Curated annotation (Swiss-Prot):
The gene is GRID2IP. This is Delphilin. Keywords: Cell membrane, Membrane, Phosphoprotein, Postsynaptic cell membrane, Repeat, Synapse. Residues 226-269, 478-502, 525-549, 568-600, 618-672, 718-783 are annotated as: Disordered. SUPFAM superfamilies: Formin homology 2 domain (FH2 domain), PDZ domain-like. GO terms for biological process: long-term synaptic depression; regulation of postsynaptic cytosolic calcium ion concentration; regulation of postsynaptic membrane neurotransmitter receptor levels. The modification Phosphoserine is found at S580, S621, S652, S655. Pfam families: FH2, PDZ. Residues 820-1211 form the FH2 domain.
Length: 1211
């Protein structure tokens, strides 16, 4: 049978070649004409077309496949087919039964209908593997739909976890998230089907996590999470952290009342984080969305037109628009959302939330069977800030994961999400503040501030500053006393919260709760007990110095009650062993301990001889070792000591003159923080602002930390308060962890109030060192004392007396070792050890020190080691210099100071005397001096003015300085500078000529490569064709025949419609499909990137300098007469004879390079006079670099698709 002749082109493919195609991806051969070229090539009906010219076309429709084959340069194009089974597709539009039975031996080899060909002739079929994995992914998606069909939130979490795993490749996180989202009975089957999507390098870890029972542990941890919070170092977790508090305007509720339910009513229905969120892409093209919007902040969809793009995207009435193309739309007005939607492009992406979802309280969520599954749905809150905002090198989401446990992260994200709806600062502080209970966690406040408006930032800072800025109110003076009022402290700036210690876990006594719950008329009669470290709870509007019970915010009262209830159980047993000197108080009259009351401004304060910081109800402040503001700036005045019910202490100072203001003593106690630059800057700034009124004394050491006391003295001296502490305080303090305090250079330190000049300080009478204060606060009284020896020798508390005895000002017992301490005024400051403290010493070697009685002996021993002499910071007195025995010799200096200094250094490096250097210059021996030394001698040579001054110098040379003597001797050499330049030129000529020759050769070779590159010319032709196609229909109807080559650097600036790629990506993709041989065009241009770095002007200038130096040397050879001593003319003439041929060769190479460069510029249509070589070659170098990067992006995308990593969005 005769064979039909093969056509000359592919324009009639496939009919001209004797076969027909059908199908819509993949395509099948429907019919093959006998005797045609297709029949002769082995093509049979039913064959599936998989490849055309090596390109995978299994997913292309018939029209696209035909278009691709007709553009192939080879005639006919090579095809890769999958042989048909026993039957082929019929003449329908899609795959059908085959018309012919071919290749029956396959059945005998085990091939059956429906099998997928994965390997053909020893080669893997990536597209077949890809389809196999895609089918398994679809099966997995169907199983998820079957199990989680009624749980859309859990289903969304599963796919979000898979998408996150595809990006981060973390198996443990994947298993953790799936465990939280999936029911326990569904974990096993779904994880088995999920294993195929795990890369091989991670499957071992995946199997280990599943097989070794870690999955069961995660399930158990999830079930127990609602009942017991994870314990973190240095903080007691409180289960009520996640409970939603009442608003600031709500009245305080009793502890036995259940927490109220919150509801936030929006226009579109009830809003809440419980609504199911989903991401929707609307393919609208040039059409409208097809929905109507209502409301604002956020807007919601009122109605959707049937058949519209919104209806096709499954949007429905009641959906609220939260994000548009990644932009937050939740707080935008209606008009702004409409304008943003109009400019959102052809395929905008929306994040919507279903409407009509009840807003459940946090307590309900804790009792739900799957409380932690909401953590993944709240992940968008952690990722709302851009990754460019970082603190300590981490983003917001990274800091949340690094600092907080999963329940804590849930609480913070849930609080922020709720805040976005109600915008209530008080509720945000109450919800977030108990979680951020350590200095390390308080870094998160800097991120939270980024989510607030400027007004909300200022309000939040005022609220927190008032809430944290406790000032002990021991007395409020009567108006008739006419006392001098204290200035109001300035509010902290915005950045002051960045590093201040916010941990204020204080205990609120029953008196405070009673004062908050009482009516306005009862409050003046109810004294307010204070404990160390407690602050007045204000609403942010009243000053902390004058608390008003009518303006107390219930939000902060509730927060105080939370913190109070969380510590009663823990500290109850510890407080029983604490003994403190009781004192008289009108508030409480029974019990071994007396409560000191703080009266309201309308109440007269009862005088007392001494002042003690007392604990409420016998409870020790748990924050004594954790919370710490740097300074407690007490603005209240201490009342003068007057005779009271008890005897007057013998050591107390006499009462001051009633006509003068009562004396006071301000005590600033600083807990020694961890070593950091911020800490040092804080102390420096504080010392500068406080000036001479502050005295920094490293006075003593406690088992936990060292302190610095800063004390102010009035004319009347100071009052010292002491309290005996038991060993239980030290133990409880060490268990709580060391105080981590931070400061910032931007923190504002208010200056101290004006006071009379300080008199000579009074010595302390048997004063004990202050312990670590609760919240760093001090009233006029001295802080609690903790002797070192009480760690191992606790003092049992005395039995409670029937009536409180008088309080002595100085306890009779003194800790051993501390009694021998010098007075604080004469104590020498010592250097501090910059160590980092162990946060939790329990179970370590440091936790065992308290059990060893030898530690007390060591603590006493170090007091006698004279450490102050070795590490004292006081500078020794400088000895008075005696009279000079001889007057300094006066010298004459002519050189500038800089030149003289550098000349002295150079003489030390030369290792040549001036006479030897003169001999070198006269004999012109280049080997005796290095080129660098010659260049320095030229640089430091005298200028014309200095040469005239040397010539006018008529005195003895010995009166000159050493550099001037050297220069004076060098100037006696004829043509001193010319000789130096000649020697330097002779030493560096070879290096310069090689450098210039290489640059010129690079320009010449790069010009030739650009002119002769056919691949580059083909690419430019392809770009021209693409541009003319895009510009067709523009006002200029004539097609462009050429373009300026600088357009090549702008190809990546033209974006595609979806914004994901550029014109350069499309160019690279098209070349890889149609002209793959052109992809390596950069290999034809290896010299072009090097030529782009050559500066043509500098090159021309260097050549001109060489010619100028040679002319100068020639003139010097004629002017300097040769002699037996001076060999300049003879040496340099001989040198010029060998140097001039090399320069002539350079001149010829320069002419040739410039000629080739001009031809290349003209070849590409550029002006040779206006275009420099570096600009010309730089265009092509930049195009090559960008093209390689675009090609790498395409290949990386192809690699991900061929490796089977199917995105969950494609399912």
């Amino acid at each position: 049978m005769a064979t039909t002749a093969t056509p000359a082109t592919n324009q009639g493919w496939p009919e001209d070649f004797g076969f027909r195609l059908g199908g819509s991806g993949p395509c099948f051969v429907l019919e093959v004409a006998k005797g045609s070229s297709a029949h002769a090539g082995g093509l049979r009906p039913g064959d599936q077309i998989l490849e055309v010219e090596g390109l995978a076309v299994g997913g292309l429709s018939r029209e696209r496949l035909v278009r691709l084959a007709r553009r192939c340069p080879r005639v006919p194009p090579s095809l890769g087919v999958l042989p048909a089974p026993d039957g082929g597709p019929g003449p329908g539009s899609g795959p059908a039964a085959p018309t012919t039975v071919l290749r029956a031996p396959r059945c005998g080899r085990g091939l059956a209908l429906g099998r997928e060909l994965l390997r053909l002739a020893g080669r893997k079929r990536p597209d077949a593997v890809h389809r196999e994995r895609r089918r398994k992914a679809q099966e997995f998606s169907r199983k998820v739909d079957e199990i989680l069909g009624d749980q859309p939130t859990a289903k969304e979490q599963v796919f979000a976890a898979l998408k996150q795993f595809a990006a981060e490749q973390r198996v443990d996180d994947l298993v953790w998230t799936l465990t939280l989202a999936l029911p326990r009975e569904a974990c096993g089957p779904l994880l088995d089907n999920l294993r195929i999507f795990i890369p091989k390098k991670h499957r071992a870890r995946f199997d280990e996590v599943v097989s070794q029972g870690l999955l069961g542990k995660l399930c158990r941890a999830r079930r127990a999470q609602g009942a017991q919070r994870l314990r973190r170092s240095r903080s007691e977790e409180r289960p009520e952290r996640l409970l939603v508090s009442t608003r600031a305007s709500a009245p305080p509720r009793r502890p036995d009342e259940p927490p109220p339910r919150r509801a936030s009513l929006l226009v579109g229905g009830l809003a809440g984080p419980g609504g199911a969120r989903r991401t929707v892409r609307v393919y609208k093209g040039n059409k409208s969305f097809g929905f109507t919007l209502r409301g604002h902040g956020p807007v919601w969809i009122e109605s959707v037109l049937p058949g519209s793009p919104a209806d096709n995207a499954a949007l429905k009435s009641g959906d609220r628009i939260l994000f548009l193309n990644g932009l937050d739309m939740r707080n935008c007005s209606h008009d702004k959302v409409v304008s943003m939607l109009q400019g959102s492009g052809a395929m905008p992406t929306l994040v919507v939330e279903e409407g009509l979802v009840p807003f459940a309280s946090d307590s309900d969520s804790l009792d739900s069977p799957n409380p932690s599954s909401a953590l993944t749905s709240l992940q968008w809150v952690a990722e709302i800030l851009p990754s460019s905002i970082r603190v300590q090198g981490r983003t917001f989401s990274q800091q949340l994961e690094h600092l907080l446990t999963p329940p804590e992260r849930y609480g913070v994200c849930r609080a922020l999400e709720s805040f976005f709806q109600h915008r209530n600062i008080d509720t945000l502080i109450v919800d977030v503040y108990p979680v951020l209970d350590t200095p390390a966690k308080q870094v998160l406040w800097q991120f939270i501030y980024q989510l607030l408006t400027y007004e909300e930032q200022e309000l939040c800072q005022e609220k927190i500053a008032c809430f944290l800025g406790y000032t002990a109110m021991t007395a409020e003076p009567e108006p008739e006393l006419d006392l001098e009022s204290e200035p109001t402290p300035e509010p902290q700036p915005r950045s002051s919260l960045r590093a201040s210690s916010m941990c204020r876990r204080s205990l609120r006594s029953q008196g405070l709760e009673a004062g908050l719950s009482c009516g306005p008329s009862e409050c003046p009669e109810m004294p307010l007990p204070l404990i160390p470290g407690e602050r007045q709870a204000g609403d942010g509007t009243s000053l902390p110095e004058t608390p008003n019970p009518k303006m107390m915010s219930a939000v902060y009262a509730e927060l105080e009650s939370r913190l109070n209830s969380s510590f009663k159980g823990k500290m109850g047993t510890v407080s029983k062993s604490r003994a403190s000197p009781p004192g008289p108080s009108p508030a409480v009259t029974t019990g071994p301990r007396t409560l000191s009351g703080v009266s309201w401004p309308s109440e007269r304060l009862l005088p007392s001889p001494c002042y003690h910081p007392l604990c409420s109800g016998g409870l020790a402040s748990p924050s004594s070792s954790e919370s710490h503001p740097y300074a407690s700036l007490d603005s209240s005045r201490a009342p003068s000591p007057q005779p009271g019910p008890g005897p007057i202490c013998p050591d107390s100072p006499p009462s001051p003159d009633p006509t003068r203001p009562p004396s006071r003593r301000k005590l600033f106690t600083f807990s020694h923080p961890v070593r950091s630059r911020d800490t040092d800057r804080f102390l420096d700034v504080l010392s500068e602002q406080l000036g001479p009124r502050v005295t920094i004394v490293d006075d003593f050491l406690t088992p936990e930390n060292d302190y610095e006391e800063m004390s102010f003295h009035d004319d009347q001296g100071s009052f010292v308060t002491n309290e005996r502490s038991s060993a239980s305080d030290c133990i409880s303090s060490s268990e709580e962890g060391s105080s981590l305090t931070y400061s910032s250079i931007s923190d504002h330190i208010p200056p101290p109030p004006l006071s009379p000049p300080p008199p000579p300080p009074l010595p302390f009478h048997d004063a004990k060192p202050s312990s670590r204060s609760s919240d760093g606060s001090r009233g006029p009284a001295q802080a609690l004392a903790k002797p070192l020896t009480q760690l191992s020798h606790p003092v049992p508390p005395p039995p409670p007396p029937p009536l409180p005895p008088p309080v002595p000002c100085a306890p009779p017992m003194l800790s051993r070792g501390l009694g021998h301490r010098r007075s604080e005024t004469s104590h020498m400051s010592v250097k501090r050890l910059r160590w980092e403290q162990v946060e939790n010493s329990e179970g370590t070697i440091w936790g065992q020190l308290g059990e060893d009685s030898d530690y007390d002996k060591l603590s006493d021993m170090v007091k006698y080691l004279d450490l102050e002499l070795h590490f004292g910071t006081q500078k020794p007195a400088k000895p008075v210099p005696g009279p000079e025995p001889f007057r300094k010799k006066e010298v004459v200096e002519i050189l500038s100071h800089k030149k003289a200094y550098n000349t002295s250094i150079l003489l030390a490096h030369l290792k040549l005397s001036p006479a030897e250097l003169r001999q070198v210059l006269m004999s012109m021996e280049p080997r005796r001096l290095e080129p660098a030394h010659l260049a320095q001698l030229l640089l430091f040579a005298p200028d014309a003015d200095e040469e005239q001054r040397y010539q006018a110098f008529r005195e003895a040379p010995g009166r000159l300085s050493e550099p001037d003597q050297f220069v004076l001797q060098m100037l006696s050499v004829p043509e001193y500078k010319t000789r130096l330049r000649s020697l330097h030129f002779q030493a560096t000529l070879q290096e310069k000529t090689e450098e210039i020759r290489g640059s010129l050769e690079c320009l010449r070779q790069a010009s030739l490569e650009l002119k002769n590159s056919r691949k580059l010319a083909k690419i430019l032709e392809f770009v021209l064709a693409m541009g003319n196609y895009l510009n067709d229909g523009q006002p200029k109807t004539n097609k462009t025949t050429g373009f300026k080559i600088n357009f090549l650097t702008e190809l990546n600036s033209t974006k595609t419609v979806d914004g994901k790629s550029t014109f350069l990506h499309i160019l690279a993709k098209s070349l890889s499909q149609h002209f793959p041989e052109l992809l390596g065009f950069a290999q034809d241009l290896p010299t072009v990137p090097l030529a782009a770095k050559v500066n043509q002007r500098a090159l021309t200038s260097d050549l001109a300098d060489l010619h100028g130096t040679i002319s100068e040397i020639q003139d010097a050879c004629q002017s300097i007469s040769p002699s037996s001593e001076d060999k300049f003319a003879m040496v340099m003439s001989s040198f010029l004879e060998t140097a001039q041929p090399a320069l002539r060769a350079l001149d010829g190479l320069q002419r040739e390079a410039m000629e080739e460069l001009g031809k290349a510029l003209a070849f590409f249509g550029e002006d040779s006079k206006a275009t420099t070589s570096e600009a010309f070659f730089g265009i092509f170098a930049e195009f090559m670099s960008k093209f390689e990067r675009a090609l790498s992006d395409l290949q990386a995308g192809e690699g991900l698709r061929s490796s089977g990593m199917v995105s969950p969005l494609a399912w």
